[in-house]
Amino acid sequence: MSHIRFNPVSERKHVNRFTEDGENIIKWLGMAKPYLSILMGPAGCGKTQAVEEYIRRNNLTAEHVACHPGLEANDITGGYTPEVGPESQPLIGWLDGPYTRAAKEGRVMLLDEITRLNQQHVGKLMSSLDETRLLTNPESGEPTIKIHKDFHVIATANPPATGYNTVNLDEALKSRAMIYKFIDKPLCDERATLMDILGGDQAYVDAFMKWAEDLRSDASTAISTRDLCYLAKMVGRGFTAMEAIDLNYKDKVSDDKKGVVLTGASAHFEN
């Protein structure tokens, strides 16, 4: 079968473009500062990109933690670490973690995929997220840390029980969030972004968007914005769409849905 004709281009840089919903999220994060904001939604829908754009537009500094079940307390709030003394002797000293640094210095604290974080660590953060705005850290020699007025915690989360290695968010944590928003649509303006990546090739952009719409009619095959952009970048590097889909996306769905993915792609990208 022949493929849609496309002139391969070197990978193009593109700026983040957001939908109206995405722009609203960026605006609302600023309005909610310094209170906790939690954005819940499937992987690749643009949650973290929207947070990063909020940070960039407002010229803020941020600390980042990519949450996972094996994360230790010292990865978040800090811990004792070995260091070398003035006479080259081994010492043990306290080192603030990213959360503590952000709390002291008034930075944004991005907790990415917080539903993968061990709940005992979440409990330690509670008092820093309510009206008391205090971080208890007795191990450091500073039993109570007064939090900077500009400290702002933003968390992203993948829904539990939907194929992600996640846990339910603590109800006490939810109650501390000024914004607790479920994202059910891509926050990225996908068409504009694909036009950037593919150098304005309208036929290929249309094919990608129609194929993505078909996939999203079934939750088990729904494609994320991230994967859609990866596929477009692969096409821009010279892969055919079918090659890109076979290498990037086909094996991300269950075996019984692989045929659906490939048949749908063939209908849009081959003639």
Regions found by a protein language model. Name each.
Residues M1-N271:
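C-terminal regulatory/interaction module of P-loop NTP-utilizing enzymes
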